[in-house]
Each structure stands twice: as structure tokens, then as C-alpha cells.
């Protein structure tokens, strides 16, 4: 890579590091077995369950079925030691069948897994590949992005739903509806509702929400940006309930930005600020996961200040937000709230501990160079971010598009390749040490439209120029293992061709989607998730074929076609897909019924993957990746150092 396009701060990379094994284990949520039962055919129920991160490798299980509440019957003649996936064809379909597992430790059966609605098939239930969560969607609203956390400490996930009404992209003027959050148990019980109020604008770039156990009490909290008029889950108002800071009328201002602008008859480019919230206080609030009550509120950092300083006068770039969860010290996670990526970028790390919300550090690009494009840390952010321990010292770094920020808030490096729309961080190439980053970039003045770099140092491994006029912007790009003949992840984008992890073209053809992915069938390759379909790449015929369609469901975010959430939520190590129904009355959680020979711990006990689920709702949603290579020819998955807490009653 040419020196003029790479700015590396080498000093932090040369300092001695502490090996992760010498650090205390990360505290994570205590999960149950996550037993899930899917009636795939009239006389076929597929049951799967979790292997937990700390489980001994040789841990075996017995599987039980209870019909209409009778004494459970063991279904396996010998302990199950392989994949945690079982097909039951001997059940009575006229009975309500509930499944549970018991681990066998040192020859002794352990207590049964907790009873769960997702492990029960009602009598005479139809065959269907999902279970449903009924919603109480307000009129005019749509269930959009979701996240998960154990809100009540019972060892299973609850679902937090961001409900959207009228929304606007940051580049478009107009009044929006008030953002709403609902929290549901898996049986559809509504736990609470939070209304962010009229002073939080609705749109993909405004409300980034984090659901995680930040204080280590065994129960997850919700952290997000709030304002005057936000109503918490117990009906209390934050700030001034009557305040309304929305810009009224057109309020046209001069604009150099073609996005959202109009040209007047006299040739001036003007942009409307109608509906934008460009005044008034901004807050950051921690909400109790059990009740939705506001636990603490602080001023949002950074404040918007001079709107023009972020790149335009009408409110587009000033309100570009991102967020993530990161383990910045030895044990507990922090919330990292971010503002700006086209020009100035500010990241603020917050701790919620012992009932106090405190600021850990602030990174401000403009404190590391001039407020112009010669500053290597300005304009480097994406519409998304990733969190990973890139130097393997047990603490996380924030991969903020084309740059990386250390766990202590200092800059690690900048590639100076600028803004982009997609970002993938994992051990994408297992033939080389450490993690890699695959990213796309939209500025045609920069040398690479797609690039593959060392996540630790930022050093370019390979890159390729972007498109040519009239479409120089590389708008999409992904990195998934879809071809077993080549080590590591295959890589493709809106540019021609399918690349291997070394950047070599292995096919002139490529899959027909450049979006999400999901581990769905029984092998270690990843399948393609686009809209409400799961497909697979056939590397022999170089075609994509359909595996599954989620009938009656639709994806979110228009052409982005994202699921509400995709994650290893239940059952074995493969991933579930959450989609909303077309009438917006349900969330459906789809889980694979395809058998597998592979046994892996739940991906939710891989630290990087779990953090990816926390940030999946942010900006332009991106698929999650673990911190190790999961694919054809993989080595045994690493066993992370974790600790768990039993919540107090």
C-alpha cells in the first residue's frame, strides 16, 4: 500500500501486551440449555439444545419427552455424545409434548433443563418451521430491528423490539413518529414499553440501542440516547415533557451537499431543516431490563455543538450515530456511544456499575489532528462498526470503519481509506495469524474500493480499486466461507468476481446476494440470508440455489433486506433468524431442522460473536462473526475464559 494512503501509529502496536490467559475471565450471561422443538412434519419433531462454553468436551446428554405433563420418558437408549440435535418420530401428536435434556457429568445425571415454551409442541399443532411471538404493535408502527438479553436473569433470552413509524433518513427533512421499544418474553408477554419521544428523530442512523448486562448482576440493561420527553417503562418522563425542539417549517439553508437538497430557480442549492432536532439537551439513559425504568441519565457525549462543524448546515451528518459493547477492562463490559463518521468522529465509553453511570474515556478525531481532511482520523467511520480483541490481550478494540481505537480510547491506526457501507472482522484467513478485516469504501479518489487488512496493525494484505463512473461506490461486500476448496472465507462485493481470502479471483460468477449469512444446514460452510430466504452457493455449478423461504414474513430496512435479528439464540450452534410477519403482528423465530454431525459450543459464549449480536441493530446492519475461523477445515474452536453470575432474587 502506498505510504500516502496508510497512516499507522506504530508505537502502541510495539508495546508489550498481556496475554489473555493471564487476565481474569470475562463475565458473561448465564444461559440455560436453550432447548427448542420444531415440528417439521406431521410425525417429526426436531429437538436441539446448547453446548455451553465451559462444558467439558466429553459431556453427554439424555433427552426426555413429557406427554400432557406425564413423567418424562427418556428417548435415547445410550447417552448422546455427538451433535446436540435429535429427531423424534415416536411422539403422540394428539398430546402436548414437552422436551428437556439432562447433562451427564461423571456418570451422574444433572437436573433437567428449564421448561420453556419453545421446547413444547401443543397437541395437534400444525407442522411449521418456526415459533411465534405475538406482538402488541401500535397502529401505524412496524417491528424493525431487535436485540436480545436476559432481562430477568432466568437463563433465557428476552426480545427487545425497536418499533418504527414514520421514519426519515438523515438526508431527508420531515417530521417522524416517536421511536418505541417493547420487551417481550418468548411466550409473547409484554414486559414494558419505552417511548423515546418527539425529540428523538426516527431513522436507521439515529437510535442505536445496546442490550447487555453492563453491571454484572446477571440481568441485562438497555442503554440508548434519550431526550426531553422520553417516557420510561414505568411511565416516568425524562426531562421536560412539554419540550418540542423539532424544526418547524421549511427553514431552508444553503447546502453544498446534493443529498436532501433542492436547487432553487436562481441556481442556489438549499436544504430544508424541517423536522430535524437541532436544539435542546441530549441524554444517555440506562434502563432496567426487568421494568424499563430509567436507572440513570447523563448528558450525551459529544454534544451536537455547532451543526455546521460536522459537515453540513441542515442536520444530516451531525446526527450519524453508532454504538457497541466492548470489554475495555479485565472483566465487565462498557457501552461505546459514537457520533459522526463523514468528518469528525467521537467515541465515548461509559460504565454502568454499582448504580452509577460514569464516563471511562472519549476519543475525538479532532484532538488528533486538524479539523480537515488531512487528519487521518476524520471521515474514516462506516455506517457500522465492529468490536474485537485484535491484539489478543483480553481487551477489546473498536474497529471504526477504516480506523481502529484501542481499549483505552487512544487511536491504534487509520488506513485513511475513508467511509464505507460494510465491515467484516474475524479470522477470515486461517492460514495467517490473528484477525483480519474486510471492508468496502465508496470514495473513488482512494486507491481501494475493497480491502483486506490485518485487524491488529491495519497493514494492507490486499485491495482492489472501486468501480468506475457512473457507479464508483462499492455499495456492498461480504466475507463468508462458501467454498470448501479454498481455505478461509470467500469474498465478494458489487465488483466483478468471487475472491478467495488471498484476493485471487476463483470464479467470474458469484452468489446472487451480497447481504447476510447464516449457519443453517449441517456442514460448516455458511449459507446466504437475504430477505426472507436462505440459499446456498454451489461451488461446482457456480450457482445459488434456494434452501428455505420464510413464508408470510418480510425483512426490514427496504433494499437492505435485513432480518430483525440473526443469531445463535437457541438450540445447537447454528443460527436462528427472526423476521416479522407481513401484517406486523408477530415475530417468527426460524430454526433449522436439518441434521448435523458437528458439535460446537453456543456461539453466544464466543466473546466476539456475542458482542456482534449487541451491535447488529446499529446503522446498516451487518452479520455477526465469531473471533475464530468457523468453516471447512477449521481447527477445534477455542475455549474462551468466561465467568458467570447467579442473579440475586
Annotate the PLM regions.
Residues 1-4:
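Positively charged n-region of N-terminal signal peptides that target proteins for export
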Residues 61-63:
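Short beta-strand elements bearing conserved aromatic residues within extracellular beta-rich modules
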Residues 7-16:
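Bacterial N-terminal signal peptides
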Residues 21-29:
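Proline/serine/threonine-rich low-complexity linkers at boundaries of modular beta-sandwich domains
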Residues 28-33, 42, 51-56, 66, ...:
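Beta-propeller-forming repeat regions
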Amino acid at each position: 500500500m502506498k505510504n500516502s494512503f496508510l497512516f499507522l501509529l506504530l508505537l502502541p502496536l510495539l508495546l508489550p501486551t498481556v496475554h489473555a490467559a493471564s487476565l481474569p475471565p470475562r463475565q458473561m450471561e448465564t444461559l440455560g440449555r436453550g432447548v427448542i422443538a420444531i415440528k417439521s412434519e406431521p410425525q417429526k419433531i426436531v429437538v436441539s439444545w446448547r453446548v455451553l462454553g465451559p462444558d467439558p468436551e466429553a459431556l453427554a446428554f439424555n433427552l426426555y419427552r413429557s406427554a400432557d405433563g406425564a413423567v418424562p420418558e427418556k428417548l435415547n437408549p445410550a447417552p448422546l455424545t455427538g451433535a446436540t440435535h435429535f429427531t423424534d418420530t415416536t411422539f403422540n401428536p394428539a398430546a402436548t409434548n414437552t422436551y428437556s435434556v439432562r447433562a451427564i457429568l461423571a456418570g451422574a445425571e444433572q437436573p433437567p433443563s428449564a421448561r420453556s415454551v419453545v421446547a413444547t409442541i401443543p397437541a395437534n399443532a400444525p407442522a411449521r418451521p418456526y415459533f411465534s411471538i405475538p406482538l402488541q404493535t401500535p397502529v401505524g408502527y412496524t417491528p424493525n430491528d431487535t436485540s436480545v438479553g436476559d432481562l430477568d436473569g432466568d437463563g433465557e433470552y428476552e426480545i427487545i423490539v425497536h418499533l418504527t413509524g414514520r421514519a426519515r433518513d438523515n438526508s431527508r427533512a420531515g417530521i417522524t413518529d416517536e421511536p418505541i421499544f417493547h420487551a417481550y418474553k418468548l411466550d409473547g408477554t409484554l414486559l414494558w414499553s419505552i417511548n423515546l419521544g418527539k425529540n428523538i428523530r426516527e431513522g436507521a442512523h439515529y437510535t442505536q440501542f445496546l442490550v447487555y448486562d453492563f453491571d454484572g448482576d446477571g440481568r441485562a440493561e438497555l442503554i440508548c440516547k434519550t431526550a426531553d420527553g422520553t417516557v420510561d417503562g414505568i411511565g416516568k418522563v425524562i426531562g421536560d415533557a412539554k419540550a418540542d425542539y423539532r424544526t418547524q417549517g421549511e427553514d431552508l439553508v444553503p447546502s453544498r451537499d446534493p443529498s436532501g437538497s433542492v436547487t432553487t430557480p436562481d441556481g442556489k442549492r438549499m436544504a430544508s431543516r424541517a423536522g430535524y432536532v437541532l436544539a435542546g439537551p441530549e441524554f444517555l439513559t440506562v434502563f432496567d431490563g426487568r421494568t424499563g425504568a430509567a436507572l440513570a441519565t447523563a448528558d450525551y457525549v459529544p454534544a451536537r455543538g455547532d451543526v455546521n462543524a460536522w459537515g453540513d448546515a441542515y442536520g444530516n451528518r451531525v446526527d450519524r450515530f453508532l454504538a457497541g459493547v466492548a470489554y475495555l477492562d479485565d472483566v465487565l463490559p462498557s457501552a461505546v456511544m459514537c457520533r459522526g463518521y463523514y468528518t469528525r468522529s467521537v467515541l465515548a465509553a461509559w460504565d454502568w456499575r454499582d448504580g452509577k453511570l460514569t464516563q471511562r474515556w472519549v476519543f475525538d478525531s479532532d484532538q488528533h489532528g486538524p479539523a480537515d481532511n488531512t487528519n487521518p482520523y476524520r471521515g474514516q467511520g462506516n455506517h457500522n462498526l465492529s468490536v474485537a480483541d485484535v491484539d489478543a490481550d483480553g481487551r477489546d478494540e473498536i474497529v471504526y470503519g477504516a480506523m481502529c481505537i484501542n481499549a483505552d480510547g487512544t487511536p491504534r491506526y487509520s488506513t485513511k481509506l475513508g467511509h464505507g457501507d460494510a465491515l467484516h472482522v474475524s479470522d477470515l484467513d486461517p492460514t495467517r495469524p490473528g484477525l483480519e478485516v474486510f471492508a468496502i469504501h465508496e470514495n473513488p479518489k482512494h486507491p481501494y474500493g475493497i480491502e483486506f487488512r490485518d485487524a491488529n496493525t491495519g497493514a494492507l494484505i490486499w485491495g482492489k480499486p472501486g468501480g468506475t463512473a457512473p457507479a464508483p461506490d462499492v455499495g456492498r461486500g461480504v466475507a463468508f466461507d462458501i467454498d470448501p476448496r479454498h481455505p478461509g472465507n470467500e469474498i465478494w462485493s458489487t465488483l466483478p468476481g468471487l475472491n478467495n481470502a488471498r484476493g485471487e479471483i476463483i470464479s467470474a460468477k458469484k452468489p446472487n446476494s451480497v447481504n447476510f449469512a447464516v449457519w443453517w444446514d449441517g456442514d460448516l460452510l455458511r449459507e446466504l440470508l437475504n430477505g426472507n430466504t436462505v440459499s446456498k452457493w454451489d461451488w461446482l455449478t457456480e450457482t445459488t440455489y434456494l434452501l428455505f423461504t420464510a413464508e408470510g414474513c418480510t425483512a426490514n430496512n427496504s433494499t437492505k433486506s435485513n432480518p430483525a435479528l440473526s443469531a445463535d439464540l437457541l438450540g445447537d450452534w447454528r443460527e436462528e433468524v427472526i423476521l416479522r410477519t407481513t401484517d406486523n403482528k408477530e415475530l417468527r423465530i426460524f430454526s433449522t431442522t436439518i441434521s448435523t454431525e458437528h458439535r460446537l459450543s453456543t456461539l453466544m459464549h464466543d466473546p466476539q460473536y456475542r458482542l456482534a449480536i449487541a451491535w447488529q441493530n446499529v446503522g446498516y446492519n451487518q452479520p455477526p462473526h465469531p473471533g475464530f475461523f468457523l468453516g471447512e477445515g477449521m481447527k477445534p474452536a477455542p475455549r474462551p475464559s468466561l465467568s458467570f453470575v447467579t442473579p440475586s432474587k
